From Swiss-Prot:
One of its GO terms (cellular component) is plasma membrane. Interacts with SCIMP. Interacts with SOCS3. Interacts with DECTIN1/CLEC7A. Belongs to the tetraspanin (TM4SF) family. The lineage of its organism: Eukaryota, Metazoa, Chordata, Craniata, Vertebrata. Residues 39-59, 112-241 are extracellular. One of its GO terms (biological process) is negative regulation of myeloid dendritic cell activation. This is Leukocyte antigen CD37. Disulfide bonds: none annotated. B-lymphocytes. It holds the Pfam family Tetraspanin. Glycans are attached at residues 170, 183, 188. Keywords: Cell membrane, Glycoprotein, Membrane, Transmembrane, Transmembrane helix.
Length: 281
């Protein structure tokens, strides 16, 4: 076996192994995009409610994952069977996917400020209309979950809940906040929380009934609640995840660029090897 044949054989199996890896990676990308679309319990869904293009990007991410899996399968078969038509198709579609992912990464990075502004607008609107419409609770439950996970209360501070008319105690000027603001680690006393929870619900009136999730209730502002707003934590979360998404897009793009180079090299040199083998027969 000549050096060129050994090199082509090495490239062939290299493409096969790494396309197998990218098949698994494409499955993970698809699952991540699908999770953003269907998950209604995390603050990722709250971000999606605030910025419609995020839902579009999630769908693009899911489709991108499916395309990555299909291309990886195409590359595996084309490299292993040494089929020029499949390798050429693999190169062309990989080039298209490369351009799409780079464009997606640039769009996400340039829309960060707009996304943060839209999130802030939705948060303040959700706080102001808290519990006013029992039929529309998706944003409220998502924000309760965000406060619980980020260990914060309100947007800038718990005083933001002054704007929520339904959480003001009847006949009292005392401020009430959702129980997602309650800092249970400050007291380590769940029994005190239960007593507080039951007594305050009765003061909020008939519309303050407990929903299906246990995260919805009310607490007086003097209780042990988180004193920091969620603005900084949520903006930091958005910033870190946007950087991660852009980094993944660029990293995968560079790998795809390398695979395109190897596939076109293998595709162009297969005929030369076969012609030489035919002369030796």
């Amino acid at each position: 076996m000549s050096a060129q044949e050994s090199c082509l054989s090495l490239i062939k199996y290299f493409l096969f192994v790494f396309n197998l890896f990218f098949f698994v990676l494409g499955g993970l990308i698809f699952c991540f995009g699908t999770w953003i679309l269907i998950d209604k319990t995390s603050f990722v869904s709250f971000v999606g409610l605030s910025f419609v293009p995020l839902q579009t990007w999630s769908k693009v991410l899911s489709v991108s994952g499916v395309l990555t899996m299909a291309l990886a399968l195409l590359g595996c078969v084309g490299a292993l069977k040494e089929l020029r038509c499949l390798l050429g198709l693999y190169f062309g579609m990989l080039l298209l996917l490369f351009a799409t992912q780079i464009t997606l990464g640039i769009l996400i990075s340039t829309q960060r400020v707009r996304l943060e502004r839209r999130v802030q607008e939705l948060v303040l609107r959700t706080i102001q209309s808290y519990r006013t419409n029992p039929d529309e609770t998706a944003a409220e439950e998502s924000w309760d979950y965000a406060q619980f996970q980020l260990r914060c209360c309100g947007w800038q501070s718990p005083r933001d809940w002054n704007k929520a008319q339904m959480l003001k105690a009847n006949g009292s000027e005392e401020l009430f906040v959702p129980c997602s603001c309650y800092n249970s680690t400050a007291t380590n006393d769940s029994s005190g929380f239960d007593k507080l929870f039951l007594s305050q619900l009765s003061r909020l009136g008939p519309r303050a009934k407990l929903r299906q999730t246990a995260d919805i209730c009310a607490l007086p502002a003097k209780a042990h609640i988180y004193r920091e707003g969620c603005a900084r934590s949520l903006q930091k979360w958005l910033h870190n995840n946007i950087i991660s998404i852009v980094g993944i897009c660029l990293g995968v793009g560079l790998l795809e660029l390398g695979f395109m180079t190897l596939s076109i090299f293998l595709c162009r040199n297969l005929d030369h090897v076969y012609d030489r083998l035919a002369r030796y027969r």
